[in-house]
């Protein structure tokens, strides 16, 4: 990206604004590409994955990476927020596109498990008793608990699952099942989470 500071005073504010918008759009697009790539690499290699692997996944140079995220903590927090938003937006979309509300719930819980891989990695970057960690945790709950509640309500209204399951309790249970999953190859957290979601079904 070229330096916009050399535009000079000759073109006036209007032209500079017009030229700046595409560059800001490109920067946002590059950042989103990096965040998507980092999330993918984190799931397979953990939050300590080499920067070059993330840059390669995104198809950009390491220099571009560091312009967006000077430190690993900056990257992890940005990925955390990015995945929270992606998870939140996926809920209503899955309700629209899935064959049944329970299928939407199962798919969404799978995305939530992917997110938890990144979330657990924050422990090495932010102290659990720090203000930053508490702020992110509150943000996570505020955004995702209502989405999970909407999916549960839709599945209950369709008669697929029991109606007494609380979103927070389900998410907490899924989170607990995922703890330590990346350090024990004999433990298949996804399988147990799948059994949990299946167990929500109403008996026929």
Question: Which stretches of residues belong to each language-model region?
Answer:
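Hydrophobic alpha-helical connector segments
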Residues: 78, 89-118, 133
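Short hydrophobic/aromatic patch on the recognition helix
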Residues: 59-69
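Basic, helix-initiating cap at the start of DNA-binding domains
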Residues: 1-57, 74
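Helix-turn-helix/winged-helix DNA-binding modules
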Residues: 46-47, 67, 162
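Short amphipathic alpha-helical segment with a characteristic S/N-K-E followed by hydrophobic residues
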Residues: 71-76, 87
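Hydrophobic/aromatic residues within well-ordered alpha-helical segments
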Residues: 30, 83, 87, 101, ...
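Amphipathic alpha-helical packing segments from all-alpha helical-bundle domains
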Residues: 85, 118, 125, 132-160, ...
């Amino acid at each position: 990206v070229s330096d916009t500071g050399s535009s000079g005073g000759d073109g006036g504010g209007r032209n500079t604004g017009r030229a700046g918008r595409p560059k800001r759009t490109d920067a946002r697009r590059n950042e989103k590409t990096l965040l998507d790539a980092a999330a993918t690499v984190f799931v397979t290699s953990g939050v300590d994955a080499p920067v070059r692997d993330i840059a390669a996944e995104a198809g950009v140079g390491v220099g571009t990476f560091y312009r967006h995220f000077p430190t690993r903590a900056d990257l992890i927090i940005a990925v955390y927020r990015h995945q929270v938003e992606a998870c939140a937006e996926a809920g209503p979309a899955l309700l629209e596109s899935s064959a049944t509300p329970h299928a939407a719930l199962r798919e969404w819980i799978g995305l939530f498990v992917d997110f938890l891989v990144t979330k657990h990695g924050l422990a090495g970057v932010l102290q659990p008793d720090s203000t930053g960690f508490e702020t992110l945790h509150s943000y996570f709950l505020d955004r995702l608990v209502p989405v999970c509640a909407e999916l549960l309500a839709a599945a209950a209204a369709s008669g697929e699952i029991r109606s007494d399951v609380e979103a927070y309790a389900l998410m907490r249970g899924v989170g607990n099942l995922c703890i330590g999953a990346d350090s024990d190859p004999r433990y298949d957290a996804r399988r147990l989470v799948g059994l949990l979601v299946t167990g929500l079904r109403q008996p026929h």
